[in-house]
C-alpha cells in the first residue's frame, strides 16, 4: 500500500499483513458516519459487530460476523485468515465506554495491525444539537453499569449520561423528582 493509504494490496499472499480496523459509526446511520469510516467500511472484506451496527451500515454482498464479545471477535479473526481487512463496527466514537477497549487487548493475540477510526461522539452530537459547549460536561454511563446520576446532576451544571434501554429515562426522571431535582432541564436524544 502507498504511504498514507488504508488499502492493503496483495502481491504475495503469504506476506500480506492483516489490518483490523475498529470503526466508530457515530449515531448509527450512514449519514452520520464520517467519510473516513464509510471508506473503511467499503474497503473491508468482512464486517463484524452487533446486529444493530451491521444493520446501520448495510452489507451489500459482504460477509458478516455478528457478535459484540471482544474475545470471540478476536478468535474469529484469528481463525479466519482469509479475511485480510476485517472491520469491527462500534457505536459512537470508540472512546467513551466503548467495546474498543477490550478489543485492543483481545487483538494483541492476533497477528495483525490494528487501526482505529473514531466516529462522532454522542455527547458531541447532542451538545451540538442543543447549542451547548461540552468542555464542562460531567460524563456518565449506566449502560451495563451503575452510576450515581442524581449525585452527578446535583454536583454539575451539565451532566451527560448514556442510559440503558427500557424505561431508563422515566426512572431517571422519577429519581430526580424524588431527590428534589424536579427543576432540572432534561434533554433526551
Predicted regions and their residues:
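Hydrophobic side chains in well-ordered alpha-helices
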Residues: 76, 99, 126, 149, ...
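Class I S-adenosyl-L-methionine
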Residues: 1-120, 124
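Short hydrophobic/aromatic-enriched beta-strand-loop microsegments
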Residues: 63-69, 111-115, 134-141, 181-188
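Glycine- and other small-residue-rich loops at beta-strand/loop junctions that grip anionic moieties
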Residues: 92, 115, 141-142, 161
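Short beta->alpha connector loops
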Residues: 27-30, 68-71, 142-146, 165-168
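Short, glycine-/small-residue-rich phosphate/pyrophosphate-handling segment
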Residues: 122-155, 164-165
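Generic secondary-structure signature for well-ordered alpha-helical cores
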Residues: 46-49, 82, 131-135, 174-182
Amino acid at each position: 500500500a502507498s504511504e498514507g493509504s488504508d488499502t492493503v494490496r496483495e502481491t504475495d499472499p503469504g506476506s500480506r499483513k492483516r489490518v483490523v480496523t475498529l470503526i466508530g459509526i457515530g449515531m448509527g446511520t450512514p449519514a452520520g458516519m464520517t467519510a473516513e469510516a464509510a471508506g473503511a467500511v467499503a474497503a473491508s472484506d468482512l464486517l463484524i459487530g452487533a446486529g444493530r451496527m451491521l444493520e446501520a451500515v448495510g452489507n451489500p454482498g459482504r460477509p458478516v460476523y455478528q457478535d459484540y464479545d471482544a474475545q470471540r471477535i478476536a478468535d474469529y479473526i484469528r481463525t479466519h485468515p482469509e479475511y485480510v481487512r476485517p472491520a469491527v463496527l462500534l457505536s459512537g466514537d470508540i472512546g467513551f465506554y466503548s467495546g474498543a477497549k477490550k478489543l485492543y487487548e483481545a487483538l494483541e493475540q492476533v497477528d495483525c495491525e490494528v487501526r482505529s477510526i473514531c466516529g462522532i461522539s454522542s455527547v458531541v452530537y447532542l451538545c451540538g444539537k442543543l447549542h451547548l459547549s461540552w468542555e464542562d460536561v460531567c460524563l456518565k454511563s449506566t449502560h451495563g453499569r451503575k452510576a450515581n446520576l442524581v449525585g452527578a446532576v446535583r454536583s454539575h451544571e451539565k451532566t451527560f449520561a448514556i442510559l440503558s434501554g427500557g424505561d431508563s429515562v422515566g426512572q431517571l426522571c422519577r429519581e430526580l423528582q424524588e431527590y428534589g431535582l424536579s427543576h432540572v432541564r432534561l434533554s433526551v436524544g
